[in-house]
Amino acid sequence: MGIPAFIKQVKEEDYVILPGDFSWAMYLDDARLDFKYLNDLPGNKILLKGNHDYWWTTIAKMNNFIKENEYKNIYFLYNNSYLIENKIIVGTRGWNILDTENNSKMIKRENARLELSITDGLKRFGNDKEIIAFMHYPPINKNDVIGNEQTEFAKTLKKYNIHRCYYGHLHGPSHKDAVEGNIDGIEYKLISADYLNFDLLNI
């Protein structure tokens, strides 16, 4: 797509959800140029943590960073939620569900964050609106589908009647591992930049 097309498609009042991996910076202060780059693009950007976002820190520190640098259109999705066009936007980083060594602890932690985000949305915006979930890591894999099993993330999405989940993380040859389509009532979609040919996807 490229930046000219982004500028052409996105209006100032639009929201663009970016599900992780924005900067190679190790610390928040080192990511200033990347944040300025995002801030200078049209539209409001909602950032979700990716596995390479080592600069990510507490929500208070990140919000202060945004305020101090006078970035006007960057927000974070982290244990919270947003209401956009009468839809509740929730999400979390997730975890590699094939990582058996750290699987239980990290998946439980990230699943708890997903539930915090969902309950925040329900509390603030009511239970009469569609909830759309975003994650960085895939919430399910092909083995789960073949074995007719549910991951903790899928169970949480099902519990709160969420029917759409978008995720990233998979690039290049890993695209073949993506699970897309309707699985047990939930529509999954891979939205990694290279998978979308660096184009935007209208949610």
Regions found by a protein language model. Give the residues of each.
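Receiver (REC) domain switch-region micro-motif
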Residues: 16, 131-133, 165
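Active-site environment of divalent metal-dependent phosphoester hydrolases
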Residues: 23-27, 51-59, 81-83, 96-100, ...
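Conserved catalytic scaffold of divalent metal-dependent phosphoesterases
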Residues: 58-148
